[in-house]
A protein has these predicted regions:
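Ubiquitin-like/PB1-type beta-grasp interaction modules and other compact soluble beta-rich domains
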Residues: 10-183
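Single conserved hydrophobic/aromatic residue that forms the stacking wall/gate
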Residues: 1-12
Length: 183
């Protein structure tokens, strides 16, 4: 039965993927590396490889069920990372008149996220990183991964929050993501 073999293949793929992540984390910890730049042979799993379907939805400014804003700041080893201008606008996916913006996007480099949807739906923070095409969850951000030497911290209005990519964006909230050496 082809459907059974296809499903079994999916199980093996998930197991192999999990094994690769565990081996990568172990090798990364032993090499005391906090990102892939110094450890290029390790294939890092990325959340951007399996984007949330909401990251592929396109909108314009008319008929919105939701139009909210949150602020995002990202720090990697003490240095603030710039969030690109017009991220999620006129992309390969969202480029049509009347639908040239992704559901979460920026208009400038201030870190202000625009959450705009046709219906009033919950929007996970991970959708923004999927649109950006970069990794973000409890295991790390960009090519930086949590290890025995480095940690990932996220705060919402200064309060620690461990929801990471699953955090549902709320109007007016300030999100700070910090990747740093453990103290």
């Amino acid at each position: 039965d082809p459907s059974k073999s296809r499903g079994l293949g999916d199980v093996y793929k998930r197991q192999l993927s999990t094994l690769l992540v565990l081996v990568s984390q172990e090798l990364g910890a032993k090499s005391d590396s906090s990102n892939s730049d110094s450890n290029d042979f390790i294939a890092l799993e990325s959340t951007a490889d399996t984007p949330d379907p909401l990251s592929k939805e396109c909108v314009d400014h008319s008929g919105l069920g939701r139009h909210d804003h949150s602020m995002l700041a990202i720090y990697i080893n003490g240095e603030q990372r710039e969030i690109p201008t017009n991220l999620g606008i006129n992309t390969e996916i969202c480029n049509q008149e009347g639908g040239n913006m992704h559901t979460v996007h920026t208009h400038d480099a201030s870190g202000r996220l625009h959450i705009e949807t046709a219906a009033d739906v919950d929007m996970p923070l991970g959708v923004f990183f999927d649109i950006w095409g970069v990794h973000f969850n409890e295991t790390g951000i960009f090519d930086y991964r949590v290890s025995n030497t480095h940690e990932l911290i996220m705060t919402i209005d200064g309060v620690t929050n461990n929801q990471f990519d699953d955090y549902l964006l709320v109007d007016g909230k300030e999100i700070t993501i910090i990747f740093q050496a453990r103290s």
